[in-house]
Amino acid sequence: MPDSSFDGKAFVLTLPSQPGVYRMLNAAGDVIYVGKAIDLRKRVSSYFQKSNLSPRIQLMVSQITGIETTVTRSEAEALLLENNLIKSLAPRYNILFRDDKSYPYLLLTNHAFPRLAFYRGALDNRHQYFGPFPNAGVVKSSIQLLQKVFRLRTCENSVFNNRTRPCLLHQIKRCSAPCVNLITPEAYREDVNSAALFLQGKQDEVLKTIEQKMFEASDRQAYEQAVLFRDQMQALRMIQEKQFVDSSRALDADVIACTTGTDKHTVAVNLVMIRSGRHLGDKTFFPQNTHEDSISTVLEAFVSQHYLNRSVPPLIILGKKIRVTLLQKLLSEQAGHKVTLTINPIGERRKWLDMATENAQLALRQKQIQQASQEDRLQALQEVLNLPGLARIECFDISHTMGEATMASCVVYDHYAMRNGEYRRYNITGITPGDDYAAMRDVLQRRYAKIAMEEGKLPDLILIDGGKGQIGVASEVMIELGLNDIPLVGVAKGEARKPGLEQLILPWQEETLHLPNDHPALHLIQQIRDEAHRFAIQGHRAKRAKTRKTSSLEQIAGIGSKRRQNLLTRFGGLKGVKNASIEELQQTEGVSRALAEKIYRELR
């Protein structure tokens, strides 16, 4: 438990000279820093003996009221634990990289006619995976490309198994329609193999195979088929010309470059992914809490945190020197294969690093321009509302369809950016359908009851997507919770309901406020309000679709989750079940004649 009379020098004497992890706590009991050490006593004592600590570290030490330690068997184990704790606790004085969702893959399923699909999650060795890719857009564009060249199916198995005629994708020459046997299993398998070779970087091999097929088709006077093969070759050659490829060998590598802004506080880390010699794309990260840290320190933190519980390529190329030996050992153990970290490469790999550095510099310039714009907008809003020091804004919206599947959203804007990780959705039940006031009351009570008990951050401003009625309800809730000192602003759409005509409802004055269409404060309000609306309607649509898809079947006596799934799988969805005859329903596993008749009757 943190102690305001904590004596750091005395505490150090109780520590062992062994590897481990230490956690520094403040008066509130929050972990403000996590570190690792080969020698716990020596490392922790350095914070209380050095006189040349940076101002930032001096401030951190002044806030320490307790330290917790964990002894580990090795420095590598300490490094692993340190990064697990940094990811889970996000201490304010550690360099933090946003923990994105797992990287997406391109999937070829284990099926007689394999399906080409976007995939994110745990890997199953029954299927073929290609990647990882830096973002979803790269995977989706790759799927479109492979559809165009190899015409592989992308439909779900439930749809594939129940088609009776080719779909639109076949008509536009994006699928060979294996669902209705317009291609033989052998020919489809050849297309799948060619697609797999292409994704493995063996484009020349694929081109030779297609060229041979083209000549064979021409010799048989199957000119229409020969033209198809010719078009495939042309498409593949165009792709080759656009791709950045390592001509020496088809290796897998990640290239990581880091750059700082002119203020030395803003840092960008660019990750370029090379798989099978192909440049799959890049992704830029902007770490938090990097004040006074060197580029080498930032890079080491990135490598440590980024590859935790992720796939690791055999080669990682870096532009600055870091402690390679420990990281290589840890990453190799985690990956199950040798991982090499290369510093300052030459030749072709130097070009890759230069490209990553240029990407990082460009992304940093763009972010600084964007942040300057956000600073101007926030400053304008502070002046309009007379709220100096305004930093954190929370916005609420309610979404439903005629009272069905009501969903509320709360989005967070803090220090010039939307904070996606702090967004929350609230499932609204137990109210009169369509009662927006009751829905707003419910979400605000649930959101701020915990914060009133000091279990979260208080916003500097609350935006409500609505007019005087919603603001009135919001004011009542905040008074009940003792939080009525937090300013509330309602964002009403106005009579024409057009962007730019919004009226701001301010509880502390009678007249509504109307800002000019080009006012930067209005632009910030619109940005936050639109994000709350998007997040709410996205959740509402998902809830509504789930309800509509399952409720009709689940309300029938005798239909549990297993029988419902059997029916939906067999008929490709609820619509197929509704259109099925009693005899067809009876053929479903677990469905008797009597139950089939009941389903037929209930769904009509």
UniProtKB/Swiss-Prot annotation:
GO terms for molecular function: DNA binding; excinuclease ABC activity. Residues 17-95 form the GIY-YIG domain. GO terms for biological process: nucleotide-excision repair; SOS response. Its main location: cytoplasm. GO terms for cellular component: cytoplasm; excinuclease repair complex. The keyword DNA damage applies. It comes from the Bacteria. Keywords: Cytoplasm, DNA damage, DNA excision, DNA repair, Excision nuclease, SOS response. Residues 204-239 form the UVR domain. CDD domains: GIY-YIG_UvrC_Cho. It is found in: Cytoplasm. NCBIfam families: PRK00558.1-5, uvrC. PANTHER family: UVRABC SYSTEM PROTEIN C (PTHR30562:SF1), UVRC/OXIDOREDUCTASE (PTHR30562). Belongs to the UvrC family. The UvrABC repair system catalyzes the recognition and processing of DNA lesions. UvrC both incises the 5' and 3' sides of the lesion. The N-terminal half is responsible for the 3' incision and the C-terminal half is responsible for the 5' incision. Interacts with UvrB in an incision complex. This is UvrABC system protein C. It comes from Nitrosomonas eutropha (strain DSM 101675 / C91 / Nm57). The lineage of its organism: Bacteria, Pseudomonadati, Pseudomonadota, Betaproteobacteria, Nitrosomonadales.
